Each structure stands twice: as C-alpha cells, then as structure tokens.
Amino acid sequence: MNDATATRLDGKALAKQIETELSQRVAAVIKKTGRTPILATILVGDDPASATYVRMKGNACKRVGMESIRVEMPASTTTEQLLAKIDELNNNPDVHGILLQHPVPEQIDERACFDAIDLNKDVDGVTSLGFGRMSMGEPAYGSCTPQGIMYLLERYFLKNGIEFAGKNAVVVGRSAILGKPMAQMLLNANCTVTICHSKTQNLEEHVGRADILVGAVGVPELIKKDWIKPGAIVVDAGFHPTEDGGVGDIELKGIESIAAAYTPVPGGVGPMTINTLIRQTVEAAEKAAQA
C-alpha cells in the first residue's frame, strides 16, 4: 500500500458521538418512567488504579444524564459480604446495571461474585451465563472491551461497505474478559477465527494471514508490524505506559503504510470500553422501562 493510506479508527471521537445519542435515549427513559437510569459500581479495597477507573465510569454516566451509585467496601471484605451486597443491588429495582471493579482482594472468590450478578444487570458482561448465552447467539451483554471493538468495527465496515463474513480474524490473547469473548463475537459475525496465545507456535505466520487482527495479549509491542498482511484491519487492545505516552501490544509506528485501518494507542479501544458499559446500562434501563 502507499504511504499513509490507513484509516485511523478514532475510538475517542466515536465514543463522544455515541454519548450524544445515549443522552437522548436516557432523556426518553426518564420521560417515560420518571426514573433516571442508574449504574452501581462496587469498589472493594483501596487500589488507586481501580478508584480512578470507577471515577471515570461515574463521570461517563454524568455526561449522558445517568446516575452512578458508588459502593465502597473495605479490603477485608469477605466473599459472603460481597455476595450479600450484590444480592441487595440485584433486588433494587432502581439499579439497572451492576459493575464489580476488577481486581478484588485475593481472599474473595471473584468468579462467584461475578456470577452472582443478575443477568439483566450484567452490563459489564462478566457472568459465565452471559458469556455462554452470547456464545450460543442468545441475547446477553458482551464483555465491554470486545463489544466496544465490535461496535467500532461495525461502524467502519458499514461506512465502507465491508462485511465480516468470510474474513480471517486472528485474536492474539485468550483472557476471559477480552480474548475469548472477542473471538466468539467475531465467530458470531461469520469470520473464520484463529486464537493465538503464549503457547502458539509460529505466531508470525498466523498474524500474517489475518484480515482482521486483534492484539489482546498484554505484552508491549509483541506483534511486529512487518508480520502484518497489507490491507489488514488492525485493532490494538493493549496499553502499556511509556515516557512518550504509551504503546500497545502491536508495533504501530509506520502501520499507516501497511494496514487498511488501525486503532491508535491511546485513543482507540480504551474510550470504547467505558462507552460500551454506559451503552449497555442504557439498554438495560430501556428494557426495564418496557417490562
């Protein structure tokens, strides 16, 4: 491809555009029900990074006219105490979405607590039941980062007359909240999907076959740009702070002359993650309003 031809998939700009749409949908819910959509965020312990993420999610709620209830619990919290709090929120009709901020202190059974969240309020897409339903093509809220990536790609594909069907998609990474659901979503969209991970042999060969490449492995610039097929659509879900700002899991410097489209780091996938959480909470509120 010629130099500097790739489309920059600007997640920050799209998230801002979607927030305008969500504000209108929130206003419609309030007008219909007299109740403001509410996201409950549970923060266990005092991890500063987690507190920052929760604050960012609360700010995103405010921007679209939603409310955010912040539930703070001490680091000494037990699994039973956290399960009781989740049950309380499950049974509160004013709460439309529940987010348990990861990670929780090591004495807590995180999976049991995730799975205790009501499926209708699992707007972060963390329950095993929700993942199973999504895998079977049944309605469920997807894990926010891969769902945000799909939305970003759908907008780009629709604008450019591209279809997912038949594309070779390669996902590098197999985490429960990113790699696995990402692969399943691409499969649901009729892509031919390959999942690569730390035990994969000949990673370069797999990457080189990708029409759609998703880097979700958590290793700085593990995937080299010269492995990438010309004309591929490149999605980098990684972020690793550096003195210059940060890098992802894919070597992006010079990617403009190789890829058809790519997500920048930062400003690509990250903004879509929180945006998807808010969008799915609005959807939950809309469904509750129709019940």
UniProtKB/Swiss-Prot annotation:
NADP keyword on record: yes
Keyword terms of this UniProt record: Amino-acid biosynthesis, Histidine biosynthesis, Hydrolase, Methionine biosynthesis, Multifunctional enzyme, NADP, One-carbon metabolism, Oxidoreductase, Purine biosynthesis
Reactions accelerated catalytically: (6R)-5,10-methylene-5,6,7,8-tetrahydrofolate + NADP(+) = (6R)-5,10-methenyltetrahydrofolate + NADPH; (6R)-5,10-methenyltetrahydrofolate + H2O = (6R)-10-formyltetrahydrofolate + H(+)
Name of a matching Pfam family: THF_DHG_CYH_C
Any one biological process term the GO annotation gives: L-histidine biosynthetic process
EC number(s) from the headed UniProt entry: 1.5.1.5, 3.5.4.9
Gene that this polypeptide is encoded by: folD
Family note: Belongs to the tetrahydrofolate dehydrogenase/cyclohydrolase family.
Keyword Oxidoreductase: yes
CC annotations in GO: cytosol
Matching CDD domains: NAD_bind_m-THF_DH_Cyclohyd
PANTHER family: C-1-TETRAHYDROFOLATE SYNTHASE, CYTOPLASMIC (PTHR48099:SF5), C-1-TETRAHYDROFOLATE SYNTHASE, CYTOPLASMIC-RELATED (PTHR48099)
Subunit description: Homodimer.
Annotated PROSITE patterns: THF_DHG_CYH_2 (PS00767)
Source organism, top-level taxon: Bacteria
Species name: Psychrobacter sp. (strain PRwf-1)
Function field: Catalyzes the oxidation of 5,10-methylenetetrahydrofolate to 5,10-methenyltetrahydrofolate and then the hydrolysis of 5,10-methenyltetrahydrofolate to 10-formyltetrahydrofolate.
Annotated pathway: One-carbon metabolism; tetrahydrofolate interconversion
InterPro entries assigned to the protein according to its UniProt record, in alphabetical order: Aminoacid_DH-like_N_sf, NAD(P)-bd_dom_sf, THF_DH/CycHdrlase, THF_DH/CycHdrlase_cat_dom, THF_DH/CycHdrlase_CS, THF_DH/CycHdrlase_NAD-bd_dom
Name used for this protein in its record: Bifunctional protein FolD
GO MF term set: methenyltetrahydrofolate cyclohydrolase activity; methylenetetrahydrofolate dehydrogenase (NADP+) activity
Record: residues binding NADP(+): 173-175, 198
